[in-house]
Amino acid sequence: MKQPSALSALVEALRALPGVGPKSAQRMAYHLMQHDRDGAEKLGRSLLFATEHLQHCEKCNTFTEAQICEVCLDEERDPTLLCVVETPADQIMLEQTMTYRGLYFVLMGRLSPLDGIGPKEIHFDRLVRRASDGVVKEVVLATNFTNEGEATAHYLGQTLKARGLAVTRLARGVPVGGELEYVDAGTIARAMLDRRSM
């Protein structure tokens, strides 16, 4: 039996979400239509509202409803520090630690030549202009510790160092509360190499 075209369109739309394959999308679509139509309508309204009202901050490139986000407008932040992250979600995680009081630049991705993502797609020129504004003294590279994140950090670091900026990278190591027997060998090796005196 062929499913209705409206349902097929919903399944296809849900597949656009990261990590959602055809089966998961179909389960979600059927759940929304069978058990949670109010939730489906709320989801639809929220998606429409977000697409109509969210834009990228002119300074840091994160999502905002205004031209400039609240973080960039906060005069109590240290404008000499610029932390580079891959996504707005990464920025939020750093903010939740309440340990960083500088400004941000959100790449909206990471270098991945195999996927067609180069410097242009991660707003590299905007980052260089922002970091070279004469105010920024240190750039903290907080890209993820994946192969692509490491390649992105290396590329950005080389370019920004050549412009006379101090470039630092987040430390890596054993997570807080982590037990060595459950940590992978690469993480333990990096923690050993990055050890510091007490």
Curated annotation (Swiss-Prot):
SMART domains: TOPRIM (SM00493). Gene3D superfamilies: 3.40.1360.10, 6.10.250.240, RecR Domain 1. One of its GO terms (molecular function) is DNA binding. One of its GO terms (biological process) is DNA repair. Keywords: DNA damage, DNA recombination, DNA repair, Metal-binding, Zinc, Zinc-finger. Residues 80-175 form the Toprim domain. The keyword Cell membrane does not apply. The keyword DNA repair applies. It holds the Pfam family RecR_C. A zinc finger (C4-type) spans 57-72. May play a role in DNA repair. It seems to be involved in an RecBC-independent recombinational process of DNA repair. It may act with RecF and RecO. Belongs to the RecR family. NCBIfam families: recR (TIGR00615). This is Recombination protein RecR. It comes from Paraburkholderia xenovorans (strain LB400). The gene is recR.
